[in-house]
Amino acid sequence: MAPLIPGELLTEPGELELNAGRPVTTLSVSNSGDRPVQVGSHFHFAEANAALQFDRAAARGQRLDIPAGTAIRFEPGDSRDVNLIPFAGARCVIGFNGQINGPLDA
């Protein structure tokens, strides 16, 4: 066996499916602004930058279905479909743009 490298991660062979079994909502999103907009993996998508045009009611309580710590960047004039998944756990949204600041299911 080869010596371990500090901080090295040893993983099992195969693929890891993120958010397996979670319901997915696909929305079309367009950046109508003149600057790029970046949205992180755990940002409450309904509260994303106002320059992004999409169905905000359908995005309520959801986040991007991408790996944790990553983001999607929308260049000016860019349009694309994104997959969203519901927040799990306590489903309480605090902060972001201050539009909810409490439980999603109240």
Curated annotation (Swiss-Prot):
Entry keyword set: Cytoplasm, Hydrolase
GO CC aspect terms: urease complex
UniProt-listed HAMAP family: Urease_beta (MF_01954)
The family this protein is said to belong to: Belongs to the urease beta subunit family.
Pathway linked to the protein: Nitrogen metabolism; urea degradation; CO(2) and NH(3) from urea (urease route): step 1/1
GO molecular function, one term: urease activity
UniProt KW Cytoplasm keyword: yes
One Pfam family, short name: Urease_beta
Reaction(s) this enzyme catalyzes, per UniProt: urea + 2 H2O + H(+) = hydrogencarbonate + 2 NH4(+)
Cystine pairs: none
Stored Gene3D superfamilies: Urease, beta subunit
Official protein name in the record: Urease subunit beta
Main localization, broad class: cytoplasm
Subcellular location: Cytoplasm
EC number: 3.5.1.5
GO biological process: urea catabolic process
Record text on subunit structure and interactions: Heterotrimer of UreA (gamma), UreB (beta) and UreC (alpha) subunits. Three heterotrimers associate to form the active enzyme.
Organism from which the protein derives: Synechococcus sp. (strain CC9605)
